UniProtKB/Swiss-Prot annotation:
Pfam name, any one: Ribosomal_L5
Main localisation: nucleus
NCBIfam families, alphabetized: PRK04219.1
Binding partners and assembly: Component of the large ribosomal subunit.
Annotated protein name in UniProt: Large ribosomal subunit protein uL5
GO MF, one annotated term: structural constituent of ribosome
Gene3D superfamilies named among the record's database cross-references: 3.30.1440.10
Coiled coil: none
Organism of origin: Spodoptera frugiperda (Fall armyworm)
Cellular compartment(s): Nucleus; Cytoplasm
Amino acid sequence: MARVPPPALKKDKKEKKPPKDNSKNVMRNLHIRKLCLNICVGESGDRLTRAAKVLEQLTGQQPVFSKARYTVRSFGIRRNEKIAVHCTVRGAKAEEILERGLKVREYELRRDNFSATGNFGFGIQEHIDLGIKYDPSIGIYGLDFYVVLGPTRIQCTTQKTQDWQGWIPPIVLTKEDAMKWFQQKYDGIILNSKK
C-alpha cells in the first residue's frame, strides 16, 4: 500500500481587509437613551419630600424613592429607610434638561465623568441654577445627572427575535465614543482628570 502525499498547503492567504469606516453608518449614531436624576438626602422625612418636589418641578414626573440597603449607625440610617429620590427621563425632555445641566457646568466635564461603557454623569450644587425659582419652604438641593447613551438601533438588539438570521449583534460603546459624541453635540470641553 502506497502512501498518498498530503495535499499542498495553500500559499495564497486572503489579504486582510482594512477596517470599515463606521462614521457614515446612520445606525451607529448615538442618542440619549435615558437621563437619570438623583437627589440623595441621606435621611427620610420632610427634607426628602421637599427633594421630591424639586424633581417633580424639574421633570414634570412623579419621582421614585430609594431605600437604604444596610443599617449604618455612623450615618444614622436604618435598613429599608427611604433616603433618596430619583427620576428617569427620556426623549426630548431629557435632552432639554441635560442642556440646562450642562449650561450650569459651562459644558466642561472631566475624563473621569465618562464610564468605560460609554455613559457619563456629573453633579450640580444648587437646583436653582437650572432655572427653577427659589422657594424658601423647599430650600436648595444639589442633584446628580446620569446619562445613558446608545445607538439608534438599540430597540432591535433588545427585542427577542424568533429567526436567528435577523439577529443584530449589539454595538459596544467605549469611553472615547461618548467623549467624541459630547464634544460634537455640545461643543463640550473635556478636562484632564484630577490627580
